[in-house]
Swiss-Prot record:
It comes from the Bacteria. Pycsar (pyrimidine cyclase system for antiphage resistance) provides immunity against bacteriophage. The pyrimidine cyclase (PycC) synthesizes cyclic nucleotides in response to infection; these serve as specific second messenger signals. The signals activate the adjacent effector, leading to bacterial cell death and abortive phage infection. A clade E Pycsar system. This is Pycsar effector protein SaPycTM. Pfam families: PycTM (PF18967). The chain crosses the membrane at residues 20-40, 53-73, 136-156. It is found in: Cell membrane. One of its GO terms (molecular function) is nucleotide binding. It comes from Staphylococcus aureus. GO terms for cellular component: plasma membrane. Its main location: membrane. The gene is pycTM. Keywords: Antiviral defense, Cell membrane, Membrane, Nucleotide-binding, Transmembrane, Transmembrane helix. GO terms for biological process: defense response to virus. It is a multi-pass membrane protein.
């Protein structure tokens, strides 16, 4: 495999991995939002019993997961330079003609290097997103467990 083919393949892999992370985060936002709406829209938590404590804990945990998942989906470019030819935010800081000229006059080796650099930033982005999503899954599981315990106490006490 040629070096440029590998770099393009790696970039495609990273882009798909990031899309999948975003899809997971959006699914968690939807599922936990539905659970919150379904369980807590008509419930009045008064802390009179163990069931209410578990419900309140589940509510807080699921809110935290929605906030974290939204943070994972939040778009970022990772590159702080003002002008560049790779990241959309950097490209946007140039005029159309300036961008076209900059790409035209870049040497092939420099373009390859910039693409490799982008792959590095994409890998860091994917790593950060999946780190957050792992935490979201764990916190969601704790929230679901609290809801389960709440239901068990509701059955026992009724």
């Amino acid at each position: 495999m040629k070096k440029d083919e590998y770099i393009k393949l790696h970039q495609s892999y990273l882009n798909e991995y990031i899309k999948f992370a975003d899809a997971k985060a959006l699914a968690i936002i939807s599922i936990n939002g539905f659970i919150l709406n379904f369980n807590f829209s008509k419930r009045n938590i008064k802390f009179h019993n163990t069931e209410d404590i578990f419900n309140f804990t589940a509510f807080i945990l699921l809110i935290i997961t929605i906030i974290l998942a939204a943070f994972a989906v939040y778009p970022r470019t990772n590159n702080r330079s003002e002008k560049g030819i790779i990241f959309w935010d950097n490209i946007n800081s140039m005029g159309e003609k300036e961008f076209i000229e900059k790409v035209k006059f870049e040497k092939e080796e420099e373009l390859l290097e910039k693409t490799i650099q982008q792959n590095y930033f994409l890998a860091k982005t994917a790593s950060m997103k999946y780190s957050i999503i792992r935490k979201v899954f764990i916190i969601s599981a704790l929230g679901y467990s609290c809801l389960l315990f709440s239901s068990i106490f509701q059955i026992i006490c009724s």
